[in-house]
Amino acid sequence: MAENTNEITTSEWEVMRIVWSLGQVNSRDLIDLLQPKRDWQDSTIKTLIGRLVKKGFLKTEKEGRRFNYTATVPEIEAMENATQSLFEHLCGMKKGQTLAALIDQTTLSQTDILQLQQLLTAKAATAPEKVACDCLPNKCDCEKEE
């Protein structure tokens, strides 16, 4: 199983989304689904598949003359790992601001909103008054932005 989900390129994410949706897919089906959307050559798509196999995100099974591909990492796990990796690079003081911007720019269902409200209410009970800045000492504007 792959460990560095953040190493998936934007193009590889497109391949993975199809694999996650279909469960199992062969290269011909991937090509047929991706070409109208992205206008990629067969060889480009096969290269992306090969990279995902090498990175450990796809498993290959031979069936006759065809190769079938299945994901080795569940979609939700890949998304959570990629998000966590991004947030590891942010200053602690800017994570809330980033989440707020993301929520503002995202279409959410009523169920999603209710779930977020419940999560935030639970977190509020134990949240610190202030989150510490973890930038270089005296070298950032975090404290000034408050």
Curated annotation (Swiss-Prot):
NCBIfam families: CopY_TcrY. InterPro entries: BlaI_family, Cu_transp_CopY/TcrY, WH-like_DNA-bd_sf, WH_DNA-bd_sf. Keywords: DNA-binding, Transcription, Transcription regulation. It comes from Latilactobacillus sakei (Lactobacillus sakei). GO terms for molecular function: DNA binding. It holds the Pfam family Penicillinase_R. The keyword Transcription regulation applies. The keyword Phosphoprotein does not apply. GO terms for biological process: negative regulation of DNA-templated transcription. Belongs to the BlaI transcriptional regulatory family. This is Uncharacterized 16.5 kDa protein in ptsI 3'region.
